[in-house]
Amino acid sequence: MSPAPTLTPPLALDYLRELSADIRSGVVMDAKGKLLAGPKELGEAAHDLVRAAGEAEEIHVSLADGAVFAARSDKHALVVVCGRLALPSLIRYDLRLVLADLEGGTRPDAPAAA
């Protein structure tokens, strides 16, 4: 594991979009659900999703035309909306990676190759 550079919330969203072309939109919130970056209309729904998930650190909701993924830490939550061809394991890894960068923490190890 390597130390992560610190990102601002808007840069964290830009970085996520660079990591995956499947991400259509996303938000960054603080631990209390305050929107830090991303569209306001998505922020309200994202806040409700994270709050409803209790203490879950990761969330994956599949829909007919896509999926919603979320990851959170003690300081931030990231929620992204993806197309239906998004690979769940890669999106979850990217979310954890960007969370670490956002907080200046340690990056997770890359998934093992099959």
Q: Predicted segment positions?
A:
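Non-catalytic interaction/Regulatory regions outside core domains
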Residues: M1-A114
